[in-house]
Regions:
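Generic cytosolic/nucleocytoplasmic N-terminal low-complexity/intrinsically disordered segments
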Residues: 1-3, 48, 53
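Short, charge-rich amphipathic alpha-helices with coiled-coil/heptad character
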Residues: 2-18
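Non-transmembrane, amphipathic alpha-helical segments
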Residues: 16-19, 23, 52
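Short amphipathic alpha-helical heptad-repeat segments
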Residues: 23-36, 56-57
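Charged, low-complexity interaction regions
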Residues: 39-51, 69-70
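Short, charge-rich amphipathic interface segments used for partner binding and complex assembly
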Residues: 51-82
């Protein structure tokens, strides 16, 4: 994202750096690619909806989906909920 990084993005990057340092670059790239795809899919949303999508909803989805590459679904969900 070109805008200021969200707390979800920041916390995701911190999680992968601490828990999966050998795969951090790969996971950060996957997160960025998924987030950009989600943003593109929702480009037609109203400005009000865009704000919430960009700040919370879409980064949360991208973090959850990416973390599932390295941990069980429930653990990924709990990790994102902890952000």
């Amino acid at each position: 994202m070109k805008a200021k990084e969200t707390y979800l993005s920041r916390d995701f990057r911190e999680t992968v750096a601490l828990r999966f340092p050998a795969r951090a670059k790969e996971l950060n790239t996957a997160f960025d690619m998924r987030l950009n795809a989600l943003l593109a899919e929702n480009a037609g949303a109203s400005k009000e909806k865009q704000y919430h999508l960009k700040r919370q909803i879409l980064p949360g989805i991208a973090a959850y989906e990416t973390l599932q590459r390295v941990m069980p679904k429930e653990e990924a969900l709990q990790t994102v909920h902890g952000y």
